[in-house]
Structure formats: C-alpha cells, structure tokens
A protein has these predicted regions:
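Short, low-complexity disordered leader/linker segments with a strong preference
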Residues: 1-33
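N-terminal (or domain-start) structured segment
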Residues: 21-114, 161, 178-204, 297-298
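Hinge/capping helix and adjacent helix->loop/strand transition within the periplasmic-binding protein
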Residues: 30, 83-91, 104-193, 255-287
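Short, polar/charged alpha-helical segment
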Residues: 46-64, 166-175, 216, 283, ...
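Solvent-exposed coil/turn segments that connect beta secondary-structure elements
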Residues: 97-99, 123, 133, 211-212, ...
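Surface-exposed aromatic
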Residues: 154, 289-301
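Ligand-binding pocket segment of bilobal, Venus flytrap-like solute-binding proteins
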Residues: 157-239
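C-terminal lobe and pocket-closing loops
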Residues: 212-282, 286, 291
Length: 301
C-alpha cells in the first residue's frame, strides 16, 4: 500500500512516488554497490541531484560501498531510464515529471509503471533567462515582446518538451493571455547548448531551473528576469518573482529517485531506510541550502 501511495503523490503533483502497507522486511538484502543514473549530461539538473546523493551517502557513511554516477544522455531522459529498467536493485535513477509527460506526449513508451518509485527528494524553482546583451530588462517586457511577435520569438528548452522547464513557461504564457500552442520552442540537448544559442542570438529567451542558471548568471553571461517562487529567494534577492511582476504563477520543479520495476520488498525497504537517513543528514541539508533547493522528501512508505 505504501508503494501505491507514493505513486499517487507522484501523479497528483505532476510527479512520480507510491501507495504500500506496512510489512515486515526480514530477508537480508545483498547490495554491494550503488549506481545512480543521471539521464543527462554532467552539470545538468538530474546530474546535480545524482552527485548530491553520491556525496552525501559517502560523506555521512550512510552507504559505505562503492557509489558511481552514470550519465546516460538522450531521448529527454528515455535513454537513461531504459538502461535503469533493465538493471537490478543496485541501480537507481533520478527522475522528474518528464517520465510521465514523455509518455503522454507520445515521445516514449515508458511509464511510471515500468519502475519502482522510491522517493521525492527536493525541489527547485524555474526561471526565464535572456542573454546579457538582450534589450529585455524584465518579465513584462519579455511577455509583451513575445505576445506581439510570437512567430519570431524563439524560446529554448532542454532536454525536451513536456518537462517542468517547458510546462512552467506554458503556464506563464497562459496567465499572460498567450496561447501556448503558438509559441516557438527550440529543444536543445542540455543547458550549455541553450546558453550558446542565447549568446549567438539563435533564441530570444530560455526557461530552466534556477540551479542550472545560477552559475551563468553570476558570471554575467545571462540575465534572470523572473523566478517561479512565491517570494524572492534569500540567496538571490535581486531576482523578482513572476507574481510581483503581475503574472500570478508559482511553479515548483521536483526531483525524485526510482529503481527497476521488479525490485523486491526488501530492496525497497532497504533503500527507503538509506534515503531517509540521507535527507535527514547535515550534508544533504547543506547541499539544499547551497543550491537553493527546497526539501521535498516523501518516501515510498
């Protein structure tokens, strides 16, 4: 029943985690290593989450056996998730709402039913960015230019349509009275390619998570026009919210962890215990503060 509950939460929040009843788990689990699959490139959101897990589990000695992060790039996460599906209970993958929307949009045959949900871990906020040389200075200017020139206003998103970056901007557009079907989205493999496209004026703006944009913002390569949080964030107080700029949108981007479909109840209980210790540790809480992520933990039980 806990497993079903986590799945329900995933789906109800645009997410993925389960609904299962309390059962005793007496059988020992023989797991001698951990492989965390990040279904995108190093430095992207899923990868940052995977490496945060690796760092915390090792530093806190919660999992003392070898831990590796494997980057499997392609298919808007599909390549990494297909890889995970074929593995055993020692292989876990980072996920997000894209696992669900890939299937709904016809981009993948995979569904949440092909995996075992283990936990929701943390959440991030969405931002919209432009190049440092852009004449757009705030969110209202951005949306007005977009509204007047929809066919020629190009918006970058990675790694695919249907992810939270895409969906958050769709929500903003609807709130501003723009039909999202008329928007020109350009899909890139990763955020680095989006930044290059902004610099080279191939796109006018881009949507991504704050943790992905922050480094480029602090180095002066981009401007962040709005953040999807309910109020300004302490670590970047100069960035206004959509809401204070007259666009009533709040959008939270979640990150989760899952395993292959055929995990045993003992394996699920084992990882449940490990992950719970991880999110309660000082190291994990420090990473959340450092990256501006919000605690969003919900275990499989």
């Amino acid at each position: 029943m806990k497993k079903r509950l986590l799945l329900c939460i995933w789906i109800m929040t645009g997410v993925i985690v389960g609904c299962s009843s309390e059962k005793s788990h007496t059988n020992k689990v023989n797991i001698d290593k951990l492989e965390i699959v990040a279904p995108n490139v190093q430095g992207a959101g899923w990868d940052l989450t995977a490496r945060a897990m690796q760092k915390t589990l090792a530093e806190e000695k919660i999992f003392t056996k070898p831990i590796t992060v494997t980057n499997k790039v392609g298919g808007s996460g599909d390549v990494g998730w297909k890889y995970t599906k074929q593995k055993g209970g020692h292989v876990l993958a980072i996920n997000s709402s894209l696992l669900i929307t890939n299937n709904l949009l016809g981009h993948s045959k995979l569904t949440y039913k092909d995996f075992t949900p283990l936990a929701l871990l943390a959440s991030d906020w969405e931002v919209v960015v432009v190049s440092k040389d852009s004449n757009i200075e705030n969110a209202n200017e951005l949306m007005e230019q977009l509204k007047q020139n929809k066919k020629n206003f190009n918006i970058g998103v990675a790694p695919g349509l249907g992810n939270d970056d895409h969906l958050s901007f769709v929500q903003v557009s609807k709130a501003f009275g723009i039909n999202p079907a008329e928007l020109q989205f350009f899909v890139y493999e990763n955020k680095e390619k989006i930044i290059n496209a902004l610099t080279n004026k191939q796109i006018n703006a881009a949507t991504m998570t704050l943790s992905e944009a922050e480094k480029q913002y602090k180095s002066g390569k981009i401007k962040i026009l709005a953040v999807s949080a309910p109020k300004r964030l302490d670590r970047l107080p100069e960035i206004p919210t959509w809401k204070e700029q007259g666009i009533n949108v709040i959008f939270q981007h979640w990150k989760g962890i899952m395993g292959p479909k055929d995990m045993t109840e003992e394996e699920v209980a084992y990882w449940d215990s490990i992950i719970k210790k991880m999110v309660e540790s000082d190291s994990w809480k420090g990473i959340l503060r450092e990256r501006g992520w919000e605690s969003f933990y919900k275990g499989s039980g």
